[in-house]
């Protein structure tokens, strides 16, 4: 078993290139995809996007489908890359569970991709991460790039347990070796599946028109795929909702009570596209600067208004209250004496006037 594990190709995590590692681990080939090839796919998706966004200073780094420095490729890049290899992606409905996945169908099912939530730096950093599970030489392995070595599953039940454990928060895609045939669709009530491989959609579900299903089908067109999964980051699709479309955010909350359209990435929380404008960025920075300036001014005013500190006595205990009381008593006694003198002087003045009048 150790010899078989040593022959398994497994790439380790580097920056935010988890999708690159995921695809190479899936194909068991270090040259299956490169950083340059994925960047080229992301740039083509941006070029063919009919709903291009306005240019911002952050556009040099934060591209619509990837980050030029750290990677952070989104789901559009994954779908396009797999379709270029003749594979198709089908999103699995978490309400059905992993029991509906035929893990023994080695001729059709190539692997399973998950987009899982991860916590880093003691839970201070929450992000998303691409993980791939594949069957190699009759044994299922977890080829997560965060693992030191591939994790072996003892049997299919353990694989399904792993998938069911993550289904509540994860986005799971089934990677098929061949174009997905409509005759192979697992018919189940209220099943919602996203298919991104076929270009002929008119007669695809003609034989199941009377079946009470809810299918969302999307064609194999890069621009439309880009329009469907229009968001930056690794996770832009929630199993509870439809894919996020341009200009329309879903009101259903995703993992960690975030909107499924938010730009959560595999290692970085980026601002939403609606927030990623130069005017909004300058406005936010100016507001923060003004708030900080006001805080500094208020503190300086408080320092000027505050009385000087009283010196401590020889015993080491300050007596501000005693000093203030003594000063107040002195002022009061002086005022009382002035009043008494004034009354005495006024009374003596009236008396002198009365005596002078009697003499006259």
Swiss-Prot record:
Chain ranges of the Josephin domain: 5-192
Taxonomic superkingdom: Eukaryota
Pfam families: Josephin (PF02099)
Catalytic activity as recorded in UniProt: Thiol-dependent hydrolysis of ester, thioester, amide, peptide and isopeptide bonds formed by the C-terminal Gly of ubiquitin (a 76-residue protein attached to proteins as an intracellular targeting signal)
Keywords: Hydrolase, Nucleotide-binding, Protease, Ubl conjugation pathway
GO biological process, alphabetically ordered: protein deubiquitination; proteolysis
Nuclease listed as a keyword: no
EC number: 3.4.19.12
InterPro entries for the chain: JOSD1/2, Josephin
Active site: 18, 129
EC top class named in words: hydrolase
UniProt keyword Ribosomal protein, yes or no: no
Molecular function GO terms recorded: cysteine-type deubiquitinase activity; nucleotide binding
Its job: May act as a deubiquitinating enzyme.
PANTHER family: JOSEPHIN 1, 2, JOSEPHIN-LIKE PROTEIN
Name of the protein this chain belongs to: Josephin-like protein
Lineage: Eukaryota, Viridiplantae, Streptophyta, Embryophyta, Tracheophyta
